[in-house]
Amino acid sequence: MYAQKTTIRAPMGKVAQLRSLIAEKYLPAVSARTGFVAAYLLEQVDDPDACELIQFWDNQTAIENLNRTGVLQASIQTIAADLPGVHIQREGYIIRVAIGNVPELAQTAHT
């Protein structure tokens, strides 16, 4: 399994707009792609403009195929296009150790 962590810094006071873009535009496009497992948007408690978007994929090839499509809706750059001033940094990880399975959270955690 493969995980992608995207660190996102929203412009001051714009995290609600960021959350809406991710929940309504970005994640629906990404979740329809082959190999997608789940995604979680984490909002930092002590810094209201800082977020982490964690995505889980079957393997690294699945996310690389997504990035190669060039489809803007499936690209994290769609957020930058719709929310000027946002800062985005991505990192990828191969998951070597895991315990637990809570897939239902992927359906309900965005509210």
Task: Give the ranges of each region predicted by the language model.
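Short, flexible segments with low predicted structural confidence
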Residues: M1-A3, L18, T34-G35
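Short, surface-exposed ligand-recognition loops at beta-strand->loop->(often short) alpha-helix junctions
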Residues: R9-I22
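Glycine-rich beta-strand-turn "strand-cap" elements at beta-sheet edges
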Residues: Y2, R9, Y40-D49, A74-T111
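An amphipathic, aromatic/His-enriched active-site/gating alpha helix that lines ligand/cofactor pockets
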Residues: E24-K25, A29-V37, F56-E91
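Short, well-ordered beta-strand segments in beta-rich or mixed alpha/beta enzyme
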Residues: Y2-I8, A38-T69
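Residue-level signal for secondary-structure boundary sites
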Residues: K14-A16, T61-I63, A98
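Alpha-helical interaction segments
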Residues: V15-A16, Y26, V30, D46-D47
